[in-house]
């Protein structure tokens, strides 16, 4: 199935006061933590933006410019992705540690219940944040992300059954040569493909490999009901009209235990929706923030 190839290629490719009201305008600032680099700028109701595997915060540049005049933006980047210096410590248990680190930063800066936007792996991190730290996520916009990628292998797939495959992908990343072309189905534009390839080439293979394994083998579906009190919107890519029914069915099944989630298809887009369909993405973000 081509839809499976899209998402598996994404994995293999990287083979305020405390209310939602007015906020004092903080100075633009960047802080490097153990696992994350966080940049905060602007004022207004806070919005956290979390990119995906091997991606920088810059993947959100266009929409950040659009919404930045009305919101305090908290731009998150995993250290080791897209040119940032990797962590000097162990990278195991990366995603839970990064989520806890983000929650701690938000708490230290007296930011409660921000809107959180996460793409791909960043979508999983957003859901983990909302479950583990309810005060750190007021609403979620999940962008082309499934709660368990293993479901693409069939209804009997589990984290244990897909682990050997993703461990092979990790080994290929760590021991292989630098990629020379962007993997398929990441973007449908030459500009988007060039950006994605540059980010991938600039990423630390060890960090990306660990994040890949954790992302692919985390099954968040049993935890989705814990988000029932959270406003959740899920955007998902539909590369062509022939794939719409398949994509619709996949996302309905994936999020069936979260009936309050609003599922929104984005037509004529590959995995990086914000690069392929910036107008549709901007409209979806603005609707989410209203």
List the predicted regions and their residue ranges.
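Conserved HGGG/HGGXW glycine-rich cap/lid loop of the alpha/beta-hydrolase fold
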Residues: 34, 39-86
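Active-site loop/oxyanion-hole signature of alpha/beta-hydrolase fold enzymes
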Residues: 75-117
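Gly/Ala-rich beta-loop-alpha elbow adjacent to hydrolase catalytic centers
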Residues: 118, 122, 126
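Flexible "cap/lid" loop of the alpha/beta hydrolase fold
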Residues: 131, 138-171
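Post-His helix in hydrolase/transferase enzymes
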Residues: 275-287
């Amino acid at each position: 199935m081509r839809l499976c190839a899209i998402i598996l290629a994404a994995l293999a490719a990287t083979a305020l006061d405390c209310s939602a009201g007015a906020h004092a305008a903080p100075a633009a600032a960047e802080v490097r933590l153990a696992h994350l680099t966080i940049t905060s700028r602007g004022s207004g109701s806070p919005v956290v933006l979390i990119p995906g595997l091997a991606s920088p915060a810059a993947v959100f540049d266009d929409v950040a410019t659009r919404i930045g005049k009305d919101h305090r933006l908290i731009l998150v980047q995993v250290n080791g992705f897209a040119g940032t210096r990797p962590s000097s410590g162990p990278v195991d248990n990366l995603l839970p540690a990064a989520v806890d680190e983000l929650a701690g930063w938000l708490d230290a800066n007296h930011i409660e219940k921000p809107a959180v936007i996460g793409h791909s792996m960043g979508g999983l991190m957003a859901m983990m944040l909302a479950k583990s730290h309810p005060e750190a996520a007021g609403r979620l916009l999940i962008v082309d992300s499934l709660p368990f990628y293993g479901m693409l292998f069939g209804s009997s797939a589990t984290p244990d059954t897909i682990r050997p495959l993703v461990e092979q992908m990790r080994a290929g990343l760590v021991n292989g040569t630098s990629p020379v072309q962007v993997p398929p189905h990441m973007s449908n534009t030459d500009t988007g493909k060039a950006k994605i390839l540059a980010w991938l080439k600039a990423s630390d293979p060890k960090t990306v490999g660990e994040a890949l394994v954790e992302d692919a083998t985390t099954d968040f579906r049993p935890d989705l009901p814990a988000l029932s009190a959270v406003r959740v919107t899920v955007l998902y890519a539909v590369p062509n009209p022939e794939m719409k029914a398949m994509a619709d069915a996949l996302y309905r099944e994936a999020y069936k235990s979260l009936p309050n989630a609003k599922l929104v298809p984005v037509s004529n887009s590959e995995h990086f929706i914000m690069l392929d369909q910036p107008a549709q993405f901007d409209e979806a973000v603005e609707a989410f923030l209203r």
